[in-house]
Structure formats: C-alpha cells, structure tokens
Amino acid sequence: MNTKITNFTFDKKNLNLAEEIIKKYPPHGKRSAILPLLDLAQRQNGGWLPVPAIEYVANMLAMPYIRAYEVATFYTMFNLKRVGKYHIQVCTTTPCWLRGSDDIMKICEKKLGVKLKETTEDQKFTLSEIECLGACVNAPVVQINDDYYEDLTQDKMGKIIDKLQND
C-alpha cells in the first residue's frame, strides 16, 4: 500500500473555514493563523500532517515552508506520521507518573499488543507518550483524540480500550 501523500488542498468546506479564520487576523499578521490552519489540515487528513499539507498552509499564509514546518514539529498536537483512528496519548510527566502513568502505559501496551510509538496492524490505535496535558490534579491523564480521561486506573483504562475496540 502506497502511503505517500504527494498533494494536498483544503476541501471546499475547509477552504471556506480557513478563509474565515484568516480574516480574524490583521492583513500584516495573517501568519498568526498557522496553528488553526495546521489543525484544520490535520483533521481533514485523518489526524496527521503530510509535508504537502504543511506546504499548502504555508503558501496560503504567504510564509516560508520552513516556518510552518517548525511550528508543526514543535507542538505535540501535530502528527507528522499516520496515526490510528484512536490516538492514545499517555501523559508521563511527574504528577501523572507519581499517580501511576507507567501502569496505564503497560495496560495500553498489553491490551493493544503494541509498544510506545506504534500503531496496531488494523490502524485503529496509535500509542504515544505526551508531556503535560495540564490536568495534573486529576492524574493520571490520557488524551484520546480530542477527549481527556482523568483519574485513571488500569481497570478504567482497560475498559476504555475495550469500548473503543468494539466501536
């Protein structure tokens, strides 16, 4: 299966949305729309940003590709490789680690049959580590796509995975 993306353009709906986003910024500051436009491109492309999508957004904002690439590689919310339908991101910073994020990672690996930074064969799950999600009071925390799961135990995490596997 060839997974290389050689071209990207926003579909009509997202192009209209991108234009509306850009209008929120002054003409001399439209480059500031880089984060929402990269996010829009990633959502349109199934959860990851191929190089042509980054190039497209850079051109749309009249900025050098390297500047857009720097943004895409700096923020952990952007994925430069394909991810599964469910992107499970386990917070492993100190508060989550103290409250058992290692155990959460272990149950994820066991239930999914993959290691950190891997995607299941059926492309349904990708397991990642992430830095602080800002929900330390409810550690350990996992983000799956756009949703946070807090105060997790191995049992709770196992049930979440079971539910998603049956989806």
Swiss-Prot record:
GO MF annotation: an example: NADH dehydrogenase activity
EC number: 7.1.1.-
Cofactor field: [2Fe-2S] cluster
Record carries keyword Oxidoreductase: no
Binding site for [2Fe-2S] cluster: C91, C96, C132, C136
InterPro entries named in the record: NuoE-like (IPR002023), NuoE_dom (IPR042128), NuoE_N (IPR041921), Thioredoxin-like_sf (IPR036249)
PROSITE patterns membership: COMPLEX1_24K (PS01099)
Domain of life: Bacteria
Keyword hit for Transferase: no
Keywords recorded for this protein, A-Z: 2Fe-2S, Iron, Iron-sulfur, Metal-binding, NAD, Quinone, Translocase
TM helices/strands, residue ranges: none
Top EC category: translocase
Record's cofactor remark: Binds 1 [2Fe-2S] cluster.
Catalytic reaction list: a quinone + NADH + 5 H(+)(in) = a quinol + NAD(+) + 4 H(+)(out)
Role noted for this protein: NDH-1 shuttles electrons from NADH, via FMN and iron-sulfur (Fe-S) centers, to quinones in the respiratory chain. Couples the redox reaction to proton translocation (for every two electrons transferred, four hydrogen ions are translocated across the cytoplasmic membrane), and thus conserves the redox energy in a proton gradient.
Family, as annotated: Belongs to the complex I 24 kDa subunit family.
Protein's name according to its UniProt entry: NADH-quinone oxidoreductase subunit E
Organism (species): Rickettsia conorii (strain ATCC VR-613 / Malish 7)
Taxonomic lineage of the native organism: Bacteria, Pseudomonadati, Pseudomonadota, Alphaproteobacteria, Rickettsiales
